[in-house]
Amino acid sequence: GFVDLAKKVVGGIRNALGI
């Protein structure tokens, strides 16, 4: 669903930032 997709996007961004 949209929520799962949003979580994946946020997780990817945080991972890219090294947070």
Swiss-Prot record:
Coiled coil residues, start to end: none
Source species of the chain: Uperoleia inundata (Floodplain toadlet)
Gene Ontology process terms (BP): defense response to bacterium
Protein's UniProt name: Uperin-2.2
Tissue specificity comment: Expressed by the skin dorsal glands.
Keyword Membrane among UniProt keywords: no
Keywords recorded for this protein, A-Z: Amphibian defense peptide, Antibiotic, Antimicrobial, Secreted
Keyword Secreted: yes
Compartments where located: Secreted
Main location as per UniProt: secreted
GO cellular component: extracellular region
Stated role: Shows a weak antibacterial activity against B.cereus, E.coli, L.mesenteriodes, L.innocua, M.luteus, P.haemolytica, S.aureus and S.uberis.
